Design a protein with these regions (language model features):
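Aromatic (Trp/Tyr) and acidic
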Residues: 17-91, 101, 111-197, 201, ...
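Proline/serine/threonine-rich low-complexity linkers at boundaries of modular beta-sandwich domains
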Residues: 8-11
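Short coil/linker segments at helix-helix boundaries
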Residues: 205-230, 267-274, 292-309
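Solenoid-like repeat scaffolds
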Residues: 375-383
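Helix-capping and short linker residues that terminate individual alpha-solenoid repeat units
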Residues: 211, 240, 298-299, 320, ...
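Hydrophobic, small-residue-rich alpha-helical packing segments that form membrane-like cores
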Residues: 313-317
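Carboxylate/His-rich catalytic cores and anion/metal-binding grooves
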Residues: 223-246
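Short beta-strand edge segments in extracellular beta-sheet folds
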Residues: 98-104
Length: 586
């Protein structure tokens, strides 16, 4: 199968692969040429058909991750601005693109607006993203089975495998909670504390340190705070009430009893909803996010900040009482109705919670705990490898480096962050498509685009800490891959690029399944290539292909083409950093 077919494109992508959105003026620009030519080839940069730069390509040989023979094109900084740029080489011409200082402002806003469109428990009006995306409130009182306004605990015996194993060991609870609100996690109706935790933390980080590094686009800080508060208030509702078993812990998730078909809009969901057993991981996510929220909202809303900090401290105490209550892998059930988000190594979650509480309070006990963690500087855990919902140590270390505190070893923490960024730049330099994601086994993981973007947040943090432009330059080049400089020549962000994906796995952005419904909104990031191709659609279409080609833009390909809040969150950070990365060219 050709790369174009794998991407679901009706025409072949041009052999010159470039960021389809464009480049920033004054920042080194790059592209990749697909060719089996052995020697260097001439290239030309065109603006409205007029040549404005030229040079020779650099042969890079066979890129195993892409399954292609390639050259790289290093254009250097461009001091012009315009919308009609293209690169020509070896008889091929790239898709047109722009060079503008404000290139990423629209993407930053769109990536953030995605969260508003994922809101549960509230009507989405046409003013948010247009009439096509307007919908009634989902999972509210009056919805089938009562929605999320009065949710019971999962009854005992509802999580028994075919082998007779009860994943929750007989657990249930007599309490019911109003867990209205929050974000739908992905393309289904589940809401998960561990995925919400890292996502809201990164939106808070966009306020706390991204906004201190570059000026945010107009109105974005207000929108960031509004979205963060929406999720934080939901996290607080997920706590087990006083007097119940596991009081103070956070329920791991609230979800449907069974998977719903595509399409199913939130307000039409017919499934009963249940609270799943609390987990230590979910609780520590709540602790960390609430403590960070207490810092961010301290000036704007001291009362809300105090509520968040009180909840963080109380739930931390509850986690100490139940340090190893793990969420099971519910995927082993025949029809689980929700993702498991299971995790057996909580060292990073404990570190993250202690870090955020220390940064919020200066508490010496939390300082002792974070310094004793395997995830702290000098410890055995490489916290910056594959930052994700299941590996949050790197996020904690970045916040410890970026947020002012009295930490005695602050210089060592900051040095560890910049050293990680240097390693990322070194990896990036070896990749002909300019991205820093290069697993040792050559296989791309689930959500590879999210993992890549989290590596870029490390570069952004290093740029914030040092002001060195090489980190900014690496940040910009890494984004090229997401927006079209890849083996398939596809932009993985809907509405941004000439060949952007538009059939991501979703139950309500489901135009492919029902033409009356919309495609995913502008700014929605696809999870991207996944070597495992775990769903039947991608397995049949692209299974076994080179890593970068293990992707298809199909609504049924949930293993490679889903949308989730935790992948869009680093997109918000990176796009916001790039939106303020340069001043307009003169």
């Amino acid at each position: 199968m050709t790369a174009a077919a794998a991407a679901g494109s009706s025409t072949s992508a041009p052999r010159v692969r470039a960021n389809q959105l464009g480049w920033l003026p004054g920042v080194p620009a790059h592209a990749t040429l697909v060719t089996d030519a052995v020697g260097p080839l001439p290239w030309s940069l065109m603006l409205d058909g007029r040549e404005v730069a030229r040079g020779l390509t650099t042969p890079r040989g066979h890129d195993a991750s892409a399954g292609l023979d390639v050259h790289t094109i290093d254009v250097g900084p461009i001091d012009l601005e315009g919308d009609g740029f293209a690169i020509a080489a070896d008889g091929a011409v790239s898709d047109p693109f722009a060079v503008r200082a404000d290139l990423y402002a629209g993407l930053a806003r769109d990536a953030l607006r995605f969260f508003h469109l994922q809101r549960s428990g509230v009507e989405i009006g046409p003013e948010v993203a247009g009439e096509a995306y307007a919908r009634p409130a989902g999972h509210v009182a009056g919805s089938p089975h009562g929605g999320d306004a009065d949710v019971p605990c999962l009854p005992a015996g509802h999580a028994v495998t075919g082998d007779g194993v009860d994943l929750y060991e007989g657990w249930t609870g007599s309490h019911r909670l109003d867990v209205t609100g929050g974000w739908y996690d992905a393309g289904d109706h589940g809401k998960y504390v561990v995925n919400g935790g890292i996502s809201v933390a990164q939106l808070l980080g966009a306020c706390e340190w991204v906004g201190g590094t570059v000026p945010l686009p107009d109105g974005m800080e207000r929108a960031l705070r509004d979205e963060a508060r929406w999720e934080l208030e939901w996290l607080l509702r997920m706590r087990v009430p006083s007097g119940a078993q596991y009081a103070g812990l956070a329920h791991h998730k609230v979800s449907d009893e069974r998977w719903t078909p595509i399409p199913t809009l939130p307000h039409e969901d017919p499934q009963p909803r249940y609270l799943h057993r609390p987990s230590t991981a979910a609780t520590l996510n709540l602790v960390a996010a609430a403590a960070q929220g207490a810092r961010v909202f301290a000036t704007e809303d001291p009362e809300f900040a105090a509520t968040l900090l009180e909840a963080a401290q109380a739930s931390y105490a509850a986690a100490l009482r139940h340090p190893d209550l793990l969420a099971p892998n519910t995927n082993v059930l025949a029809n689980a109705g929700s993702g498991p988000y299971d995790d057996t190594d909580l060292r990073d979650e404990w570190y993250w919670a202690a870090v955020e509480l220390y940064l919020a309070t200066g508490d010496e006990r939390r300082l002792e705990e974070l310094r004793a963690s395997d995830c702290h500087v000098g410890g055995p855990v490489d916290v910056f490898a594959d930052i994700d919902w299941q590996r949050v140590g790197g996020l904690a270390r970045l916040h410890l480096a970026l947020v002012p505190s009295r930490l005695p070893e602050a210089d060592a923490v900051r040095a560890s962050a910049t050293a990680a960024a240097d390693a990322i730049l070194a990896t990036q330099a070896g990749q002909p498509f300019g991205h820093p994601y290069a697993p040792h086994d050559g296989r791309y993981d689930w959500g590879s685009n999210g993992l890549l973007l989290n590596q870029l947040t490390v570069l952004g943090a290093a740029w914030s800490l040092t002001g060195e432009s090489r980190y900014r330059d690496g940040l910009a080049e890494g984004m090229d891959y997401v927006l079209g400089r890849n083996a398939l020549g596809v932009s993985y962000v809907t509405g941004h690029g000439a060949r952007s994906v538009h059939n991501q796995h979703s139950r309500w952005y489901a135009h492919q399944a029902d033409p009356r419904l919309p495609h995913p909104p502008r700014g929605a990031l696809s999870g991207g290539p996944n070597s495992a191709t775990p769903d039947p659609v991608s397995a049949a279409a692209v299974g076994g292909l080179p890593a970068q080609q293990c992707f298809i833009d199909d609504i049924g390909a949930w293993g490679v083409n889903e949308i989730t809040v935790n992948w869009n969150a680093p997109l918000v950070q990176v796009a916001a950093l790039l939106a303020g990365a340069v001043r307009p060219a003169r």
